[in-house]
Design a protein with these regions (language model features):
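C-terminal accessory segments of proteins
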Residues: 2-544
C-alpha cells in the first residue's frame, strides 16, 4: 500500500492554467509493495543551482497549495509544475570524505532488528596513498558489447576467470570487488564527520563519479591480470535498439561472465526494458519506442539543471538518499531490476548488496558511465560540473591493481580521456526522438473531472487518483522560459530501502495506458532496487 501527502508554497504570481494529473493503480508485482509518503514542495527560482527552501518559504500545512497541476500514482503520476528545488544540506557544508574501513559494520535489518546475514566489509590497510592519475600512453578502448568479437571476449573471460581465482582475502578478488559496491551502498560505513549518519553514494550527486572510479580500478585489475594495459570494459549499449538484447556471451552457462541469479524470461533474445515493471509490455514494437522516449527524457528533456542529471547535493550531515538524477532513477534502476531474479529481493542484479556479483553489472554501469560522457558533450557551452568544492573535493577509498589502498577525488573524474579510456562511437537514436503530445492539455484538464489536490492528499496509492493543481503562470514568453524553468519536484518520497519501488509520472494524459510512454505526457519515473539493509529514507525527484 502506498500513501502520499502533499505540501506546497509559491512565490510566483499570475493567472493559472489547470493541467491534469492522474494516479493509476499499482502494478501487480512479485515484488513486495510498500508504503510511501511524498511531500510535494515547489518554489519558482531564478535559474540558480543552489536554490534553498528557507523556513519562511516552505509551507508544511496540507492546506496550502502551490499554483500548479499535478497527477500522481503508483502506476502513473501526472504533473506540471513551476521550477524549484529544495536543498536540505547543512548550511556550513563539508564534502563527503573517505570512511574509516575499520568501522565498517554488517548493518541491521530494521524489520527484525537482527544483524544482516551478509558481511561486505573490505580488508583493512594501514597505508593509504593519495592517488594521482598516471600519464596516459595508449588509451584503453571500451567497445560496444554487441559489436565486440570472440577474440575480445576470450580475453575478457580470461581476465574475469583469473580475478575469481585470486585468494579470497585479496582485495582484487572478484567477490572482494563486488563487496566494494555492497559496502558503499548498504549503509555499512559511518559518515566521517557525522557518525550519527550512514554513508550512501546512490541517490545523490556522487553517483556518477563514484561509479566511474569503481569501474576504473576494476578495469585496471583485469588488465593487469592478463598483462594488457589497453584492456577496456565493454558497454552494454541498451540505449540503442541494436544493443538492447543482453549480450549473448553473458548468457553462456559455462562462461565466467554467467550468473545463475537472473530473470530467465529476460535472457536473449528478450529486449531490455528501460521502464521495467511487472506490467511492462513484451511487444518489441512497444518496448523500443518506450525505451527511446525514456532515454530522451533522461538525457535531453529533464536535465536543464546540473542537479537534474547528477542528483541532489550530499555532504557531511546530509541524510542518505537526498535525491537521484535522471539516469540513476530511470534506465539505470530499471535494468538492475530487469536482469535480477523474479523474486521479492531480486538477486543478484536487482539488489544493491549482490548486484556487483553479476559480471554484467560492470557492462551495465560502463554504459551508464558512457552516458555521462555523452551528456557532457551534449551540453555545449553550458556548465557540465558543479563548481562547488563540496562536490569536487569529496573523496573515496579503493584498492588499485596493485592491491594498494588509495584515496581518490571527484575532481579527477571529470574527463574520461584524462583517466585513460575512450568509448567506441555508436549512434544515438534517442537524440532526435522528442515525443509528441497525444492530447491538448486544455482538453485533458477540462474533461477529467478531477478534484483539487488539497482535497485528496494525503492518499494511499491503491487506486487511480487524478488531481488538478494550478500552475503559477501560463503563456510565458521565451525570455521568461530562459529565466525560469518549469519543473515538477516530488520530494519527501519515503521508502523502505529493502523493497522494490517504482512509479511513473504523466502530465495531462487521458488514456490511462501506463505502458505507453512514447508521448510527451510521460514525464518520468521514480525507481529503486532493494538494498540488503532495510531502513526508511526520504528522497526526491525532479521532472521537466
Amino acid at each position: 500500500m502506498a500513501s502520499l501527502a502533499l505540501s506546497w508554497s509559491s512565490t510566483a504570481t499570475g493567472l493559472p492554467s489547470q493541467p491534469l494529473f492522474s494516479i493509476k493503480p499499482p502494478h501487480s508485482s512479485t515484488y513486495t509493495t510498500r508504503t510511501r509518503r511524498c511531500t510535494w514542495s515547489c518554489k519558482a527560482n531564478n535559474g540558480g543551482q543552489n536554490e534553498k527552501h528557507s523556513p519562511q518559504n516552505v509551507e508544511t500545512s496540507q492546506g496550502k497549495l502551490d499554483r500548479r497541476n499535478l497527477l500522481l500514482g503508483m502506476g502513473g503520476l501526472y504533473g506540471a509544475a513551476a521550477n524549484l528545488v529544495s536543498d536540505r544540506s547543512p548550511a556550513l557544508a563539508t564534502p563527503i570524505t573517505s570512511p574509516d574501513l575499520s568501522k565498517c559494520s554488517t548493518g541491521t535489518n530494521l524489520n527484525t532488528q537482527q544483524p544482516l546475514d551478509v558481511n561486505c566489509c573490505p580488508p583493512v590497510s594501514k597505508e593509504i596513498i593519495d592517488y594521482k592519475l598516471p600519464p596516459v600512453g595508449k588509451m584503453r578502448f571500451r567497445p560496444a558489447a554487441h559489436l565486440a568479437g570472440e577474440d575480445y571476449y576470450a580475453k575478457f573471460e580470461k581476465a574475469v576467470e583469473l580475478m575469481k581465482a585470486l585468494p579470497p582475502e585479496d582485495p582484487r578478488n572478484f567477490m572482494q570487488q563486488a563487496n566494494v559496491h555492497c559496502a558503499y551502498c548498504n549503509l555499512t560505513y559511518q559518515q566521517t564527520g557525522d557518525p550519527k549518519l550512514k554513508l550512501q553514494i546512490h541517490n545523490c550527486w556522487h553517483f556518477f563519479p563514484w561509479h566511474r572510479w569503481y569501474l576504473y580500478f576494476f578495469e585496471r585489475i583485469l588488465g593487469k591480470l592478463i598483462d594488457d594495459p589497453t584492456f577496456g570494459l565493454p558497454f552494454w549499449n541498451w540505449d540503442n535498439p541494436d544493443g538492447m538484447i543482453m549480450p549473448e556471451v553473458f548468457a553462456r552457462k559455462h562462461s565466467p561472465l554467467f550468473d545463475a541469479r537472473r530473470n530467465t524470461s529476460h535472457l536473449p533474445p528478450a529486449l531490455a526494458d528501460l521502464a521495467y515493471s511487472s506490467k511492462s509490455p513484451t511487444n518489441p514494437k512497444k518496448i523500443i519506442p518506450n525505451n527511446l522516449t525514456v532515454m530522451y527524457g533522461e538525457m535531453v528533456r529533464n536535465v536543464s539543471k546540473l542537479e537534474d542529471f547528477y542528483g541532489a547535493k550530499y555532504v557531511v550531515g546530509t541524510a542518505p538518499d537526498p535525491g537521484p538524477g535522471s539516469v540513476e532513477r530511470g534506465s539505470h534502476m530499471a535494468l538492475h531490476g530487469w536482469v535480477g531474479e523474479n523474486t521479492p529481493t531480486g538477486e543478484d542484479m536487482g539488489n544493491f548488496y549482490s548486484t556487483a556479483r553479476d559480471p554484467i553489472f560492470y557492462s551495465h554501469h560502463t554504459n551508464v558511465d558512457r552516458l555521462w560522457t555523452v551528456w557532457r558533450g551534449l551540453r555545449g557551452p553550458k556548465p557540465k560540473d558543479f563548481p562547488d568544492s563540496d562536490w569536487l573535493d569529496a573523496d573515496f577509498l579503493f584498492y588499485d591493481e596493485n592491491a594498494q589502498l588509495v584515496r581518490v577525488k571527484v575532481v579527477d573524474t571529470l574527463d574520461n580521456e584524462k583517466m585513460g579510456y575512450v568509448y567506441q562511437d555508436v549512434d544515438l537514436p534517442w537524440l532526435k526522438n522528442r515525443p509528441l503530445a497525444r492530447v491538448k492539455k486544455s482538453k485533458a484538464a477540462s474533461s477529467s473531472g478531477a478534484p483539487a489536490a488539497e482535497t485528496v492528499f494525503p492518499v494511499k496509492l491503491n487506486k487511480v487518483v487524478k488531481v488538478l493543481v494550478k500552475r503559477p503562470k501560463k503563456s510565458r514568453s521565451k525570455k521568461d522560459k530562459e529565466k525560469e524553468e518549469e519543473l515538477l519536484v516530488i520530494e519527501g518520497i519515503e521508502v523502505d530501502t529493502a523493497k522494490f519501488v517504482k512509479f511513473d509520472v504523466f502530465v495531462n494524459d487521458e488514456d490511462d495506458k501506463p505502458d505507453e510512454l512514447d508521448k510527451a505526457e510521460y514525464a518520468g519515473c521514480y525507481s529503486q532496487v532493494p538494498h540488503k539493509n532495510s531502513t526508511k529514507v526520504k528522497t526526491k525527484i525532479r521532472l521537466g
